[in-house]
Amino acid sequence: MPARAAAPLPMLLALGLAATNAPAGEALLPAPAAAARQEALPPIRHVFVLLLENQSYGVTFGSPSPASYLARALPARGALLTQYYAIGHASLGNYIALISGQAPNLATQLDCSTYADFRASAASLDRHGQLHGSGCIYPRSVPSLPDQLETAGFTWRAYMEDMGKNPAREPATCGHVPPGAAETTSVASAGDQYAAKHNPFVYFHSIIDDQVRCDTHVVNLERLPQDLASVSMTANYSFITPNLCSDGHDVHCIDGRTGGLPAIDQFLRRWVPLIEASPAFVADGLLIITFDESDGAGAEGSSACCAEKALPGARFQPGFSGPGGGRIGAIVLSKFVRPGTVSTVPYNHYSLLRTVEAIFGLPYLGYAAEQDLRTFGADVFSAAQPTG
C-alpha cells in the first residue's frame, strides 16, 4: 500500500461530493464543509496517531509521573500540548470524533454494548455536519477521514494490538462482532486484549461493508514494522491502538502485568523509536500521542475547550456531567517541531482531525469545520523549515 503524493486540485475540489456518494436506498447527505482557510502547515506527508486510554493531564504529566518516558523524555524531543482536551465520555465517542467529526450520541457514550446500526432521526447532516440520532455503526453516507484520504489519492491503515489473537473472539483483520450482536470484546480475555470500542474504523458501514477494503486497512499491530521498512509501504495516515493493558485502560491486566501509565510507558518505549527511525517519519512524518479521555473524575474530568458543541437533541452533554472529556494533553513529534516546545493553545480531538485534513488538503468533517476551531499552528510546528 504505497504512500501517495498530494492529489491534484480538481480532485480536491470534487472531494466534498465524491466522499458522500450514497448507495441506492440511502439518503445522500450534504458534502462536508470545505476548508475555509488553509493554515500554513509544514510539508508533512506521513501522519501517525497513537491513542492511549483514560488519564488526566495532571496525573500523566505531573511530578512525579508514573510514566517518565511519556511525561519527560518525549516532550523533550518534541512538543507538549498542555491544553489538549478530549471531547466526551466514554471511549468510543472520542475515537469516532477523531476520524469523522461526529459528536458523541448516547450509544457511543455508553461504548455500544450492542453493535447496532445508527438510527437517524433526520434525513441528512445538519449545517454543522452532524447526523442526528443514536447508534453505533454509521450509514455509508456519513463521510469519514479514510473516505476522504482514498478519494484524494492518499493511503491509510489502522493497527490494532492483539486483534485476532483469539480467532473465536474476532477476526485478525477488520475485527468486529456481527452487526446487531452483543459486543464481546470490551473486556480483555486471556491471550487477546483487543477492544473494538477502541477501533473507530469498524463503526462505519462504508468500511466494514467492503470486506476486502476493511481487511486490507484494519490490521494487527504486528504488521507495522513491515510497513515502516520503506516510504512506499508506509501509509500516509496510520492510526495505532494498543491493547487494553498497553493503552493504560486496565489497571490490573489479565496477563499479570501492571497496567495504567507504567504499561503505557512500556509500550511507547518499544514502538515510538521504531516509528521515529522509519524512512517515512524521518522524511516528512508527524506522530501525535494522546488519550481518548480523562479519568472522568469531577468537573475537571468532563471539562472542554474550543467552544465544543454537543450533538443537537442529545439526552446528555458529551461528558455526561460536563461539556467534554477533560484535559488530557498531547505529545507531538516531528522534525518540524522544535524539541522542548510547550504549547498552551487550547485544542481537542476535533482540532486534531482538522489538522490532519488540512495537512492533506481535505475538507473539514463535522465539528472539525467549526469556525472557532483551529489547526495546530506555529505554536506546535516551531522548527525552522527549509526555504528551498
Functional labels for PLM-detected ranges:
Residues G25-G388:
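N-terminal pro-sequences and low-complexity stem/linker regions of secreted or lumenal proteins
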